[in-house]
């Protein structure tokens, strides 16, 4: 490992001690708590939707969450190790055969549903 990779690995280890990041992948429904600063107040705003993509690039890892808000599709990209991401909770796990679910952008209503994954063996 070169010097940059070593430094990034140390930073990731330090950030993982502070907050727990669950094991999730594309197709899972997530509830992401985001820190919002309003003047002097800080509050947590939750954003719930389907994870349609995950990019694992060390400290630059991110994931995309899509939800339907008032009949309009809204996508938001969250940096995984950002201090503004307060919490990540897996609401339900989905069965998909793709790593990127961009095809959901063209689907509406029941066509955009994802079946729930029922694991026979317990998750690690």
UniProtKB/Swiss-Prot annotation:
GO terms for cellular component: cytosolic large ribosomal subunit. SUPFAM superfamilies: Translation proteins SH3-like domain. GO terms for biological process: translation. It comes from the Bacteria. InterPro entries: Ribosomal_bL19 (IPR001857), Ribosomal_bL19_CS (IPR018257), Ribosomal_bL19_sf (IPR038657), Translation_prot_SH3-like_sf (IPR008991). GO terms for molecular function: structural constituent of ribosome. Transmembrane segments: none annotated. Coiled coil: none annotated. The keyword Ribosomal protein applies. Keywords: Ribonucleoprotein, Ribosomal protein. The keyword Ribonucleoprotein applies. This protein is located at the 30S-50S ribosomal subunit interface and may play a role in the structure and function of the aminoacyl-tRNA binding site. Belongs to the bacterial ribosomal protein bL19 family. NCBIfam families: rplS_bact. This is Large ribosomal subunit protein bL19. The gene is rplS.
């Amino acid at each position: 490992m070169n010097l940059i990779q070593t430094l990034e690995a140390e930073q990731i280890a330090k950030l993982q001690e502070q907050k727990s990041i669950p094991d999730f992948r594309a197709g899972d429904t997530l509830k992401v708590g985001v820190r919002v600063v309003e003047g002097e107040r800080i509050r947590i705003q939750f954003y719930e939707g389907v994870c349609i993509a995950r990019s694992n690039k060390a400290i630059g890892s991110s994931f995309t969450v899509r939800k339907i808000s008032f009949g309009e599709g809204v996508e938001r990209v969250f940096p995984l190790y950002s201090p503004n991401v307060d919490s990540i909770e897996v609401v339900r796990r989905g069965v998909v055969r793709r790593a990127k679910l961009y095809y959901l952008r063209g689907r509406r209503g029941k066509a955009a549903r994802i079946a729930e994954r029922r694991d026979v063996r317990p998750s690690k």
